[in-house]
């Protein structure tokens, strides 16, 4: 006769894998060399923190982008978005994008934070902040960083609709103007 080890009677909820457990967040990665700050979090995003991280006496321009949850998608009422990620890969991809942008545009700072879990209507799911010596480089860098994050980073979005339906989507199914990309033009 074999005995089974005693089961923990105090927990009836199965434990989540660490990458899905909000209590293991925020996950961050930084680079002092290029003043890069990256974060994946289940908490509300704070644009003031983003600007504090990218602030530099050598910067004449600071660009801040907030991506927020819309209330409709293709005519369907959206109740909320939900994001998931595999943090080790996502942070590595974010660092690659941020480092490349810092070097290409001579940035003084880069901050990227992406929210995971449920993101209600009107709340931010992504914050991108960059600082540069001049506005032209900052504008270009901010847009390029955002588009590369949407195209390359291991973060997936589930749109949840008021009618009860839901759809998983890649972050990069549409261009900056909202036009649908074909599978050969973009996406993972």
Curated annotation (Swiss-Prot):
Q: Which reaction does it catalyse?
A: 2 [molybdopterin-synthase sulfur-carrier protein]-C-terminal-Gly-aminoethanethioate + cyclic pyranopterin phosphate + H2O = molybdopterin + 2 [molybdopterin-synthase sulfur-carrier protein]-C-terminal Gly-Gly + 2 H(+)
Ranges for region Disordered: 1-23
| Domain of life of the organism encoding this protein | Eukaryota
**Annotated localization:** Cytoplasm
Mind listing the GO biological process terms from this record? Mo-molybdopterin cofactor biosynthetic process
What EC number(s) is this enzyme filed under? 2.8.1.12
Q: How does it assemble?
A: Heterotetramer; composed of 2 small (MOCS2A) and 2 large (MOCS2B) subunits.
Q: What is this protein called?
A: Molybdopterin synthase catalytic subunit
What gene does this protein come from? cnxH
